[in-house]
Amino acid sequence: REKEELNVSSETVESLSSNEPDSSSEESITHINKEKSQKFKHEGQQQREVEHQDKISRFVQPQPVVYPYAEPVPYAVVPQNILVLAQPPIVPFLQPEIMEVSQAKETILPKRKVMPFLKSPIVPFSERQILNPTNGENLRLPVHLIQPFMHQVPQSLLQTLMLPSQPVLSPPQSKVAPFPQPVVPYPQRDTPVQAFLLYQDPQLGLTGEFDPATQPIVPVHNPVIV
C-alpha cells in the first residue's frame, strides 16, 4: 500500500514537473511530500494503538461483578431435578455411665407400692338413726351435757349423723374435782326451792369444765315449834 502511494505521488510529481515550471514544481513537490509524511505518521499511530489494545484485551480476563453488600447464601441450592432422600430419625443412645446412675437410684430409692383403698360398708337407709336430743333410746349422752353445744351444730348435720350399732363409750371424765356441797347436819322440814337448787348436779359449761351452781347460797330458816 505504501509503495502504491509512493508510485502515485511520484507520477503526480512528474506530471506537475513536466507541465509547470521548475520553481512551482519544487514547491508543490515539497508540499505533497509533507502531506504524505503526515498521513503516514497518523496511520502508523493508529495501527500501533489498535495493536496495543489487542494485546491488553488478550491478557486481561473479565472478572465477575462483586457486590459489597451482597450476603452469602446460607444453604445449598438443590436443583429441581434431584430428589432429596429422607434421612432416618436418629435415636439417642444412653451412655453406660448414665445407665449405671439410673440403676443406682432405683436400688437406693425403691418405688413405693400403692395400697388399694378398701371400700367402706354402706349402711342402708332403713338402718340409719336420726339424732334426736329428746329421744332417750337413741341418745346415749345426758341431755345437760349436750345442751350447751346444740346451738353450734347445724340442723343438716343433726339429720345426717349416724349412730353406730356398737355401744358408745362414755366420754372421759375430767380430773377436776366437783365443787364441795354443804352438808346439812340435821333434817330439814319444809325446804324451800332455793335451797333445793343447791343439791342439783353441777352443770357443764362451754369450756368443758364442771361449774358450780350459779345461784347464791341462801340461808335456810326453819320454823321453831314450841
UniProtKB/Swiss-Prot annotation:
Disulfide cysteine pairs (residue numbers): none
Record-listed Phosphoserine modification sites: 9, 15, 17-18, 25
Keyword Phosphoprotein assigned: yes
Cellular localization per UniProt: Secreted
GO cellular component terms attached to this protein's record: extracellular space
Modified residues (Phosphothreonine): 12
UniProt family annotation: Belongs to the beta-casein family.
Record function comment: Important role in determination of the surface properties of the casein micelles.
Identification of the protein by name: Beta-casein
Organism: Equus asinus
Gene giving rise to this polypeptide: CSN2
